[in-house]
Amino acid sequence: EVKLLESGGGLVQPGGSLKLSCAASGFDFSRYWMSWVRQAPGKGLEWIGEINPDSSTINYTPSLKDKFIISRDNAKNTLYLQMSKVRSEDTALYYCARLGYYGYFDVWGAGTTVTVSSE
């Protein structure tokens, strides 16, 4: 069974950092481009960025490229999202997704929730 499982979400204070993980199984992770996508409460999906199979190319949405770092470990079949300098606007459900051969996301995880709050 092809699966993606995100983890690492939780409550983080404004200005803080958090590292999300996405464990892949059931397919050859090292052959696929992978992406992170998020959905803030009451809003649509927002693409964060993508990484190619050997990590030589990493693309970000311009507004997030100075805050977020995408990486991967093919030996561990795991994708990462390092978040820094988080703000309340970063509160969202964060998904990892596999980019299929036909140019669309063909496998999604269930997501992990990140809440940015000082309370």
Curated annotation (Swiss-Prot):
Can you tell which superkingdom this protein's organism belongs to?
Answer: Eukaryota
Q: Which GO terms describe its biological process?
A: adaptive immune response
Residue ranges occupied by any Ig-like domain in the UniProt entry = 1-112
Q: Give the stretches traversing the membrane.
A: none
Q: Which GO terms describe its cellular component?
A: extracellular region; immunoglobulin complex
Q: Which UniProt keywords apply?
A: Adaptive immunity, Immunity, Immunoglobulin
What CDD domains does this protein's entry cite? Answer: IgV_H (cd04981)
The record's annotation in Pfam families points to:
V-set
Tell me if Ribosomal protein is a UniProt keyword of this record. Answer: no
The miscellaneous comment for this protein is:
This chain was isolated from an IgA myeloma protein that binds galactan.
Give the protein name, as stated in the record: Ig heavy chain V region T601
Native organism: Mus musculus
Starting at the broadest rank, the lineage of the source organism is: Eukaryota, Metazoa, Chordata, Craniata, Vertebrata
